[in-house]
């Protein structure tokens, strides 16, 4: 799912990197670079912790860091709302809100759920997706368009998105019972959220497919020229 409009989709082949950048562009490059590093750290920690200490100890080693890294994504809603980036506010807010629910409303409230494989698979899906996405924006905003990053950006979601969504749904589902014991209304809210996930997931997935088609059309136009 995109949080920013692709700044390099219509760039002419052979165009040299920009020599000067506005404050806006420099800010976005820095923002995306920092987030790429943060999510790379999450990915590295998860991949190290699983074989070293097992799934049950992943959360103590990376949970707090992931929680605040994901919370930083609130800025993406602000970027879209203020026009700093050309991105659909609805889809941006939808993804950010769903992830905040997972890290704050579920795992933070019921940390024992993080011992399941669903938590680790969710983090892997999130972190790989975000490392690729933020790296892609760093390059394109800087005037580059690496083929490998572009390919990963618009193809890996076919695998990572279903993995992430299924992991999220599993965690939400397994939270309903302990949430009911804590507060009935919370369990009802989670059940409602699961129902929303069905159309919501479809919207986000088709949005990403539309972004991919847009890029493919742009490349065809460039080749024709």
Where in the sequence are the language-model features?
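Eukaryotic polytopic
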Residues: 2-51, 55, 63-225
């Amino acid at each position: 799912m995109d949080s920013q409009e692709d700044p390099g989709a219509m760039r002419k082949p052979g165009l040299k990197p920009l020599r000067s950048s506005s404050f806006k562009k420099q800010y976005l490059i820095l923002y995306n670079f920092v987030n790429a590093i943060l999510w790379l750290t999450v990915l590295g920690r998860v991949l190290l912790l699983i074989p070293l200490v097992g799934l049950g100890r992943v959360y103590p080693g990376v949970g707090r860091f992931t929680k605040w890294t994901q919370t930083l994504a609130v800025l993406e809603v602000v970027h879209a709302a203020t026009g700093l980036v050309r991105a659909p506010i609805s889809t941006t807010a939808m993804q950010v809100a769903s992830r905040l629910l997972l890290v704050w409303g579920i795992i933070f409230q019921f940390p024992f759920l993080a011992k399941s494989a669903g938590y680790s698979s969710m983090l892997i899906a999130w972190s790989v997706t975000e490392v690729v996405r933020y790296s892609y924006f760093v390059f394109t905003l800087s005037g580059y368009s690496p083929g490998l990053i572009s390919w990963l950006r618009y193809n890996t979601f076919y695998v990572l998105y279903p993995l992430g969504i299924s992991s999220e749904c599993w965690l939400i589902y397994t939270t309903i019972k302990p949430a009911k014991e804590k507060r009935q209304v919370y369990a009802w809210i989670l059940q409602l959220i699961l129902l929303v996930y069905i159309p919501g997931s479809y919207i986000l997935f088709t949005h990403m497919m539309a972004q991919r088609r847009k890029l493919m059309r742009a490349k065809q136009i460039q080749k024709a020229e």
